[in-house]
Amino acid sequence: MIRCNALIRFWDEYLQSPSVPDASLNGLQVQGPQEVNKVVFGVSASLALFEKARQAGADLICVHHGLLWGQPERLTGLLGERVRFLMNHQLGLAAYHLPLDKHPHTGHNACLMRALHGQNVRPFGTYHGVDIGFAGEIEPAALAEVVSTLEAFCHTSARVLAFGPKTIRTVGVVSGGAYSMLPQAISEHLDAYITGSLDEPAQEWCREGNINGISLGHYHSEKCGVEALARLTAEKCGIATEFIDIENPL
């Protein structure tokens, strides 16, 4: 068991959350029990996740995509129903968005870079003045081999825009819906850019920029950091944790 405020303080300090500007209201978003015995982790807040967390006996839910995004909102509609469920079932909710994207050990992008055995890894992917991804070198490998490694790691099927070098030596990684950072990868002459979702402009950017684009899906590109945080929390805080997968093809 751990006090809820002590657990939030641990996450805040480990992820350096207060120092990261973000639209997400990172930290505790909905108050639950003061004492936490079990935390359920998931990628995104939803009623489906909340119900599974209740069934799993959780006291607190921790997600990457929370409910509150820095703007005054009425507790009506979908938001109202989600908050009502949490309150009725005495479930707390915490969220960590950009702090989990950018963390050099536990973040999604660090995990993806490790899956490729990245070397000389450096911050990359500037978003509102904050580098939230990583770029680095990998052992030279065919594009198909890189894609296969990522698909196995993320348990997904990738979408590939093969317009760059056939042998990959340098990569940039920014998980989630980060197709707009593709021009940054082009300007740094990287061989491949890895993200969650690539939107319509990405095809011609890749063609004209001589770069390979690899899309893993927004959801699947951001499971690994949440899973890593769950493992770390169990190890450091001595409480039960469980990652719940609400499958999402997008």
Provide a role label for each language-model segment.
Residues 1-250:
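Active-site catalytic microenvironments in core metabolic enzymes, especially phosphate/sugar-handling
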